[in-house]
Amino acid sequence: RRQRQMCIRDRSLIMLCSSIDKTIENLEFLKAIDEKILFVSLASSLSSINNFVVSAGIKNIIFTHPISGSHKSGYENASPNLFNQKNVISVNVNDLQENQTHEIEKIWSSIGSNIINMSLDDHERFLMFTSHLPHLIAYTAMLSIDKEVDISKFSAGGLKEFLRIAESNPDLWADIFSSNSKNLKVGSEIFINNLYRIIDLFK
């Protein structure tokens, strides 16, 4: 604990590049050390973190979500151009001073990212459709394949894309699904209803 405190001494900005549960854990530790530190979360879903932020009375945080990445995790898979020409969603939930938000957005712009400002609710709803639901479908598709089928022999481009997505860190995505469960339930029901409509055409 003391070592962690020494690492953040005199820091004015900390970017939280971790999973949702680790972000909450780190915020719980960091908030008691220096209330002047500005926190920046990079999580894919904001609901769980925001619920903690509200309950803990943390005001000095901004959510930014870079729309980039890969199914591979870990520093060994790092890429210097990961954020170049990629969109970054900026969500200011605490009405931080304009200059604070601007400074964070400048950091992203300096590495080639494009800034999109959005409300928390819109972020959770839009990203459910464009990211969270597709990952859920990919995981479900892999669970649906007969175990006797040799995937390596009989799969082409379509299934390989499902395989790639399903190789994403399951713990990370379990956190995301849980955090955005309200929207994900709605999206899943829409998907299931459309699937049944297609199945009816087979009759």
Label the model's feature ranges:
Residues 80-165:
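Internal alpha-helical scaffold of NAD(P)-dependent oxidoreductase catalytic cores
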Residues 2, 35, 112-113:
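Short phosphate-binding/catalytic loops that engage adenosine nucleotides
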Residues 14-15, 40:
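N-terminal Rossmann-like NAD(P) cofactor-binding module of classical short-chain dehydrogenase/reductase
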Residues 3-8:
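Short, small-residue-biased leader/transition segments that mark boundaries at the very start
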Residues 30, 76-82, 174-175:
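Short, flexible, solvent-exposed loop/turn segments with mixed acidic/basic and small polar residues
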Residues 17-19, 43, 92:
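Glycine-rich, N-terminal phosphate-binding loop of Rossmann-like dinucleotide-binding domains
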Residues 24-76:
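Rossmann-like NAD(P)(H) cofactor-binding subdomain of soluble oxidoreductases
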Residues 150-203:
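Interdomain hinge/lid region at the active-site interface
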